[in-house]
Amino acid sequence: MMKKGTIILVAPTAIFSAILLYLVIWNAVMSFMNWSLLNSKPTFVGLETYSIVIRTFQFTNSLLHSIELSVILVVIGNILGIFIAALLYFLNSNKARSTFLSIVIYPLSISMAVNGLIWLWLFNIHIGVDWLLVRIGLPQFPWLSSTSTMFPSLVLVSVWAYTGIAALFYLAGFMNIDKTIVEAARLDGTSAFKILYKILIPNSLNSFIIATALLFLFSFRIFDLPYVLSGGTTNIFLQTSELYMYYLFTVEYFSQATAVATMITLIATIIIIPYALTVIRRWIRR
């Protein structure tokens, strides 16, 4: 029999999972219906709604932005995460390591909406980075005022906000490696860089899998940062699939909104499940 303490811990998770699963299934079912708040009897239309959504420019544009952002953040986030974790790992002072780690994960301790507001102020031409550039004799940079730099600015903010996740998992992986191996390499005169790519990185596959999965999920389903930076949902240069879904709800295109939500969930699930299964298999083998 299950212990009482185990039941108390498992029950809330099971209830939450059941509610979440119900909502996902309900959303998927409603995506095959033509419905609105004024229509008490939704009518079945099959894949017609999906066909309409897929043919729209906004959907393909927003989905492309989500995919591009995911790929860029996964690549840059992992690279920066590894090097930040390595710098923290090779610090001799635990106090210094804790201080710098707090700085790295600071963006994760506040909401993404607040992160977006901070960068919105930094991009302000009167009080932000551009003001400083002018003061030192450099030209201003059109962070959010040019269509060609809006998306790169979103990428910059996203990398700053989420790289700490990767760094945290890589540092945990590095710290879990047998220190005698690292010390032996140091005694042999091996440089820190060689220790990193010959010992630390090869033994941190679990960290890579988890960091990649989380970076993908956060970037593919990003909402707060582009919403704050663009000031709404209709800026096509910063519109992600989540923003487009929210926009459809605000204009009461509920059938199309549920279809977009279902496709977002399906894409994320298809990509994440193999990662989850890989991690589970590795833990079972251990």
Swiss-Prot record:
<comment type="function">
    <text>Part of the ABC transporter complex GlcSTUV involved in glucose uptake. Responsible for the translocation of the substrate across the membrane.</text>
</comment>
<dbReference type="InterPro" id="IPR052730">
    <property type="entry name" value="Sugar_ABC_transporter"/>
</dbReference>
<dbReference type="InterPro" id="IPR035906">
    <property type="entry name" value="MetI-like_sf"/>
</dbReference>
<feature type="transmembrane region" description="Helical">
    <location>
        <begin position="260"/>
        <end position="280"/>
    </location>
</feature>
<protein>
    <recommendedName>
        <fullName>Glucose import system permease protein GlcT</fullName>
    </recommendedName>
</protein>
<dbReference type="GO" id="GO:0005886">
    <property type="term" value="C:plasma membrane"/>
</dbReference>
<comment type="similarity">
    <text>Belongs to the binding-protein-dependent transport system permease family.</text>
</comment>
<feature type="transmembrane region" description="Helical">
    <location>
        <begin position="199"/>
        <end position="219"/>
    </location>
</feature>
<dbReference type="InterPro" id="IPR000515">
    <property type="entry name" value="MetI-like"/>
</dbReference>
<keyword id="KW-0762">Sugar transport</keyword>
<dbReference type="GO" id="GO:0055085">
    <property type="term" value="P:transmembrane transport"/>
</dbReference>
<keyword id="KW-0813">Transport</keyword>
<feature type="transmembrane region" description="Helical">
    <location>
        <begin position="103"/>
        <end position="123"/>
    </location>
</feature>
<keyword id="KW-0812">Transmembrane</keyword>
<comment type="subunit">
    <text>The complex is composed of two ATP-binding proteins (GlcV), two transmembrane proteins (GlcT and GlcU) and a solute-binding protein (GlcS).</text>
</comment>
<dbReference type="Pfam" id="PF00528">
    <property type="entry name" value="BPD_transp_1"/>
</dbReference>
<feature type="domain" description="ABC transmembrane type-1">
    <location>
        <begin position="63"/>
        <end position="275"/>
    </location>
</feature>
<keyword id="KW-1133">Transmembrane helix</keyword>
<feature type="transmembrane region" description="Helical">
    <location>
        <begin position="6"/>
        <end position="26"/>
    </location>
</feature>
<feature type="transmembrane region" description="Helical">
    <location>
        <begin position="154"/>
        <end position="174"/>
    </location>
</feature>
<keyword id="KW-1003">Cell membrane</keyword>
<feature type="transmembrane region" description="Helical">
    <location>
        <begin position="71"/>
        <end position="91"/>
    </location>
</feature>
<dbReference type="InterPro" id="IPR054947">
    <property type="entry name" value="GlcT_permease"/>
</dbReference>
<keyword id="KW-0472">Membrane</keyword>
